[in-house]
């Protein structure tokens, strides 16, 4: 937010405060100041000149020789290459020895044999950005107003002697995204009440808005407030110099005396407005509704936009004429032929505006304010002030009345707090008189009874809703630098790691030893990504004042963040990736507007590419399901939970491959999943085949693992038997291992799967799985009869339970 010191001085008295002092004071009261700039700094000897004579250069087809009055006895000859130079205009002249933008020094010289005593300048040569220069002067020099005095410094005529204070406004302080909002803030700091000199609205009582337009809002959730004023008999022209100066200093290009007023009101009130050419609407009906998937709109930038049902549009009853809150339509644009203006003021659904803005990549000052919040109490006032200004600057007449489609009931919030609570939080000893003065400076009405305050919050401060907000306001205006500093008190105890911290460090060391790298992703994400890879049902927890839609919802999984990291690396040709992350996810089962979410500590893995790169003696080995499952098994082993963990194939996670995904169970309860990211999901993230896992680390750590039991190595030999099974391809290894383990007897020591085969020889839907079973008796040598009995029981159980064929 750029704030003009001169403009601000019209509302609060800053005669005894320098711009830098003001910036410093604002910084210590809670609004960050990025810097203070004075446009004229670094420029010198640049004056007003009047072109008295202009003739073509004899040796050039694009240069002109000008005789310029710069307030001296004799005219000064200057050679100029601008296509729009002519006699009779007031111009910007850089004298010999002057400095223009870029610290460039201007010297007296010759151009094609003709003497040139300086330079006639464009706005760009004074440091203005191309984006703010009026289009009429984009390719040439700038014309100053005729009342400018020849030979005097040019800076006051362009308000380049103003100080521009750049503020960094956080999302919760969107009220400061307007000059009025900043004026209230500065007024509170210096104990002043801002005085606004709004122009008086004069209406033509003989004509009524009902003769021109009616407004209908299809769904008040989309547009809680919507109104139209009509200004007739306008004449489109350039805006006066003061208005152009203010817009250019705020980084906005002047267009004409109607559009410029809407931009001025945006800066003044923080209220976006839009002006339609009434004749081009070709209808007396304005309908605000959702677009259909078959509709298109050519916006003011000349682009054809394919609309969707997510978009709110302004229509003439039939076809769209504007993309609500984002950009108007070219079919209703203000032009030189416009004589009647339909002026729109509204509140639009911020979520819809954010989505539309993102969909079309159209970020604007208007859409940003709709997203962050607008003072609902001044929608009508902003429209009235704009109508009065348009009538004055364009010689028009405001038709009486306002066409209203929807209105919002403005409520003043009530917040209770006690003096004791304020002092307790801030560590202060403020008395009632001091706190009263602060509330009065802020413009907050209040009632106090023995230190108990009931405070009425004006609508312009919609960010204040709870006790903590009030305490923060007291701290800001009292001054953070005045809060007392105290040393920590209480007993000190020796620090130690909790079990969870100790286990987390163990696991990080384990995973890094396996070649993975730790990633740290944002806890805030989009609503769509927050709902991916979920292990249980939950509502989303949305921020009230998000910085952007990409960081608006608390995550409910870690994997989506890791996939963003994978995509970032893959885009930079880093193709072999193994990431892990330990972090919190947030589940909400209650009302997210009233209750905090439940936090769970999770661990996630994401692997893609090769685990082994090809060299002269090794073949490349790609990451697969068993790579990531092996890491999960290593984690479980460190936790001492191997015997309590089981896996079961699942198709319940839509973002995961239905044939390569498994739930992870801890004693029958889901604690995670492992598998391949669904190809469709991988394509959406623009990543190759990727394998992931996510575990509820908090739940795993909470389980008491069994103690480690050590036993001596048997002095009697172990016996191994192999068994090959022909089974249906749907039968899992885990099912077979469990059946073998349950029936092989007490001497079974180990089961090892050493071969899996599928092919045409086995028949469709079949696979061969070969196991090695190791038996040990620690007290005696095993004999064949014992082993044979165990193998017979195993074979019988496998045949009965899984219909296997023992090969």
Curated annotation (Swiss-Prot):
One Pfam assignment: FDX-ACB
Species name: Enterococcus faecalis (strain ATCC 700802 / V583)
Signal peptide: none
Required co-factors: Mg(2+)
Protein name, per record: Phenylalanine--tRNA ligase beta subunit
Catalytic activity: tRNA(Phe) + L-phenylalanine + ATP = L-phenylalanyl-tRNA(Phe) + AMP + diphosphate + H(+)
Keyword Methyltransferase among UniProt keywords: no
List of residues binding Mg(2+): 463, 469, 472-473
Molecular-function GO terms, alphabetical: ATP binding; catalytic activity, acting on a protein; magnesium ion binding; phenylalanine-tRNA ligase activity; transferase activity; tRNA binding
Entry note: cofactor: Binds 2 magnesium ions per tetramer.
């Amino acid at each position: 937010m750029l704030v003009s010191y001169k403009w601000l001085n019209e509302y609060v008295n800053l005669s005894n405060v320098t711009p830098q002092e003001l910036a410093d004071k604002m910084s210590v009261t809670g609004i960050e100041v990025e810097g203070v700039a004075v446009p004229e700094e670094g420029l010198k000897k640049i004056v007003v000149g009047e072109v008295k004579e202009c003739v073509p250069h004899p040796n050039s087809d694009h240069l002109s020789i000008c005789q310029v009055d710069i307030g001296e006895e004799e005219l000064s000859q200057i050679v100029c290459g601008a296509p729009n130079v002519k006699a009779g205009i007031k111009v910007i002249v850089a004298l010999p020895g002057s400095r223009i933008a870029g610290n460039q020094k201007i010297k007296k010289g010759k151009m094609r044999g003709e003497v040139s005593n300086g330079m006639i300048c464009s706005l760009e040569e004074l440091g203005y950005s191309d984006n703010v220069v009026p289009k009429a002067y984009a390719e040439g020099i700038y014309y100053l107003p005729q009342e400018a005095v020849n030979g005097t410094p040019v800076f006051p005529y362009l308000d380049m002697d103003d100080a521009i204070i750049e503020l960094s406004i956080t999302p919760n302080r969107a009220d400061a995204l307007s000059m009025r909002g900043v004026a209230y803030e500065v007024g509170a700091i210096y104990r002043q009440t801002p005085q606004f000199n709004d122009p008086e609205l004069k209406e033509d009582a003989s004509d009524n808005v009902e003769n021109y337009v009616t407004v209908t809002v299809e769904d008040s959730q989309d547009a809680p407030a919507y109104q139209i004023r009509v200004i007739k008999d306008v004449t489109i022209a350039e805006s006066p110099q003061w208005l152009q100066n203010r817009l250019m200093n705020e980084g906005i290009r002047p267009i004409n005396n109607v559009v410029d007023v809407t931009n001025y009101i945006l800066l003044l009130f923080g209220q976006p407005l839009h002006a339609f050419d009434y004749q081009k609407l070709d209808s007396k009906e304005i309908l605000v509704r959702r677009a259909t998937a078959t509709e298109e709109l050519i916006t003011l930038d000349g682009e054809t936009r394919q609309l969707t049902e997510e978009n709110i549009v302004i229509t003439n009853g039939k076809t769209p004429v504007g993309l609500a809150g984002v950009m108007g339509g070219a079919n209703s644009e203000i032009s030189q032929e416009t004589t009647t203006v339909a002026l729109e003021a509204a509140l639009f659904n911020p979520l819809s505006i954010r989505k539309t803005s993102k969909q079309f990549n159209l970020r604007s000052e208007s859409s940003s304010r709709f997203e962050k919040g607008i003072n609902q109490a001044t929608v009508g006032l902003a429209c009235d002030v704009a109508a009065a200004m348009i009538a004055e600057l364009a010689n028009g007449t405001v038709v009486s009345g306002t066409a209203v489609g929807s209105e919002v009931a403005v409520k003043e919030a009530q917040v209770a707090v006690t003096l004791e609570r304020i002092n307790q939080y801030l560590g202060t000893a403020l008395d009632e008189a001091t706190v009263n003065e602060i509330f009065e400076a802020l413009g907050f009405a209040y009632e106090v009874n023995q230190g108990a305050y009931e405070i009425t919050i004006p609508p312009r401060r919609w960010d204040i809703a709870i006790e903590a907000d009030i305490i923060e306001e007291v701290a800001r205006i009292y001054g953070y630098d005045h809060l007392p500093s105290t040393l920590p008190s209480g007993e000190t105890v020796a620090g130690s790691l909790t079990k969870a911290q100790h286990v987390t460090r163990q696991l990080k060391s384990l995973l890094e030893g396996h070649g993975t790298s730790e990633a740290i992703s944002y806890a805030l994400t989009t609503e769509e990504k927050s709902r991916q890879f979920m292990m249980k049902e939950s509502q989303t927890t949305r921020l009230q004042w998000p910085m952007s839609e990409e960081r608006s919802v608390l995550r409910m999984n870690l994997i989506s963040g890791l996939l963003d990291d994978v995509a970032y690396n893959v885009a930079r040709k880093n193709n072999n990736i193994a990431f892990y992350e330990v972090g919190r996810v947030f589940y909400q089962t209650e009302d997210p507007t009233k209750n905090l979410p439940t936090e769970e500590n999770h661990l996630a893995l994401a692997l893609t590419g090769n685990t082994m790169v090809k060299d002269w003696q090794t073949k490349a080995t790609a990451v697969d399901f068993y790579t990531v499952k092996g890491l999960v098994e290593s984690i479980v082993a460190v936790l001492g939970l191997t015997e309590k963990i089981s896996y079961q194939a699942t198709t319940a996670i839509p973002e995961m491959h239905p044939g390569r995904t498994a739930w992870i169970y801890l004693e029958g309860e889901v604690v995670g999943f492992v598998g391949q990211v669904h190809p469709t999901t991988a394509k959406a993230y623009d990543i190759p085949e990727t394998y992931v896992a996510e575990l509820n680390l908090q739940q795993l750590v909470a389980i008491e693992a069994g103690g480690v039991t050590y036993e001596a190595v048997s002095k009697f030999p172990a016996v191994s038997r192999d068994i090959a099974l022909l089974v249906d391809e749907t039968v899992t290894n885990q099912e077979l291992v469990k059946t073998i383990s349950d029936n092989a007897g007490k001497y079974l020591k180990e089961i090892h799967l050493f071969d899996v085969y599928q092919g045409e020889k086995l028949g469709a839907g079949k696979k061969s799985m070969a196991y090695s079973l190791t038996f040990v008796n620690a007290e005696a040598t095993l004999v064949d009869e014992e082993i044979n009995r165990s193998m017979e029981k195993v074979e019988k159980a496998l045949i009965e339970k899984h219909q296997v064929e023992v090969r």
